[in-house]
Each structure stands twice: as structure tokens, then as C-alpha cells.
A protein has these predicted regions:
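Beta-strand-dominated extracellular/periplasmic modules and repeats
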Residues: 37, 53-210, 217, 221-231
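Bacterial N-terminal signal peptides that target proteins for export
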Residues: 1-9
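Ser/Thr-rich, Proline-interspersed low-complexity disordered segments
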Residues: 11-68, 74, 86
Length: 231
């Protein structure tokens, strides 16, 4: 009788362990290799000081997907909020998925996500044009440092490799972006960082434009899904 009870307990514990292991297995997300076309750059990268004027935004240990408009079982979503372009946009940026150059300093940041329509359908070949300040809060207004555009893949997926931008007077950390589906409306917006003291003092801060960030082995990883009007 005792041997039978012991055998039953061992079998039950084995089943519990197998269930826990299956639940802990993460779901992988397919990625595409960035198109680093550095030959398109029309100006050499400016030298960047190793000094920074602010610490990187605080990242959690796991990605908070609450700000991702689609991808959580949603069937519909609001169009990505539009914000001012600002004075630092430069047209005709090089096509590339990485804004890093030789000698770039700062906290590495990899942003991934998708472009969806308002009915949460992925948009292939959507334009994403990014620009930002460097780690010291300075824009390159004579060349194309920290500027670049790319297009989503067949699944609407994009990946941007850059650094956490610095702050400057009146603004906290942010990244500018223009999004446009093929033959669609051009949307100009900005992305913000969670956990930044004083975000609410930024005159154009929008909670719906917060990146979902977590720490990685060599910097930070972030996610954001953009939404454009359905055709």
C-alpha cells in the first residue's frame, strides 16, 4: 500500500514539473536583418562626447505590452497619435535599420514592432522615417547622424537599432518618426520613454506613445506597434 501511494505521488509531481516547463517556454518573434546601407550617408559621422547629461530611462525586467495597440488579441485600434514634427527634420535620410556609426556612444536601444491598420491587419512595405538627438541631446543638422528610414517586411514588422537619446531644454527623451502605409496618409509622431521623471512636464507628451522597454545584455530592448488608417 505504501509503495502504491509513493508511486502515485511521484507521477503527480512529474506531471506538474512538465506543465511548468511548458508554460515557461517563451514565444519567439521572427525578426528580419537590418539593412545597414552606410554608403548612402552623405556626411561623415560627427564626433560625440562620451559624457551624457542624463541617465538612461528606467527599464523593467519584462516588457509591458499595455501600450501596444495591436498584437494582444485586439481586433481594432486607434490611429497612432499625431504630434508636431519639430524644427529638426531632414528629408532624404539614408535607408537603414541601424543608426549606429563607428564611435557612437550611449545606451544601445533596439526597437521592434509592427505597423497595423485600425482593424489590426499588418501593413507590408510601410514607410518608417526616424530621427533623434544623440546621447547628449544634440541633433545633427548638417548630416544624417541618427537619421534613417526603412520599410516594413511582408508581415508589417520593423526593427530599429539606435541609442537612447539625450534631453535638451524643454524636452525629455524622445524619438521622432513619420509613418506611411503605401498610398496612405503620412503620420508624424514621436515615441517617449517610460519611467522618466518629468515626462508630464513635456508640453507634447502623450501616454499612448510610450515605448514598452526592458533591459537587455547590451542595452535596452523596446516595442511599439504603429497604427495607420485602414485603406
Amino acid at each position: 500500500m505504501k509503495r502504491k501511494i509513493f508511486f502515485t505521488i511521484v507521477v503527480a509531481m512529474s506531471m506538474i514539473a512538465m506543465t511548468a516547463c511548458a508554460a515557461a517556454t517563451p514565444t519567439s518573434i521572427a525578426t528580419t536583418a537590418p539593412n545597414n546601407n552606410s554608403t548612402d550617408q552623405t556626411a561623415p559621422p560627427a564626433s560625440v562626447s562620451t559624457a551624457t547629461n542624463t541617465a538612461p530611462p528606467t527599464a523593467s525586467s519584462t516588457i509591458d505590452t499595455s501600450t501596444l495597440a495591436c498584437g494582444n488579441g485586439s481586433q481594432s485600434a486607434m490611429v497612432t497619435p499625431e504630434l508636431t514634427e519639430g524644427p529638426y527634420f531632414t528629408a532624404n535620410s539614408p535607408e537603414r535599420a541601424s543608426l549606429l556609426e563607428s564611435g557612437t556612444v550611449g545606451t544601445k536601444l533596439v526597437i521592434t514592432g509592427y505597423v497595423y491598420t485600425t482593424d489590426c491587419q499588418p501593413v507590408a512595405n510601410a514607410l518608417l522615417d526616424f530621427w533623434q538627438a544623440d546621447a547628449n541631446g544634440v541633433y545633427d543638422n548638417s548630416g544624417y547622424n541618427f537619421r534613417g528610414h526603412q520599410f516594413t517586411d511582408a508581415n508589417g514588422y520593423y526593427q530599429l537599432t539606435t541609442v537612447v537619446p539625450g534631453i535638451y531644454t524643454g524636452r525629455k527623451e524622445h524619438i521622432h518618426v513619420k509613418i506611411q502605409a503605401p498610398n496612405g496618409k503620412l503620420i508624424t509622431s514621436q515615441l517617449f520613454f517610460p519611467g522618466v521623471a518629468g515626462n508630464d512636464t513635456d508640453r507634447i507628451f502623450d501616454q499612448g506613445l510610450l515605448l514598452a522597454i526592458q533591459e537587455s545584455s547590451d542595452g535596452q530592448q523596446a516595442q511599439y506597434n504603429f497604427v495607420v488608417p485602414a485603406p
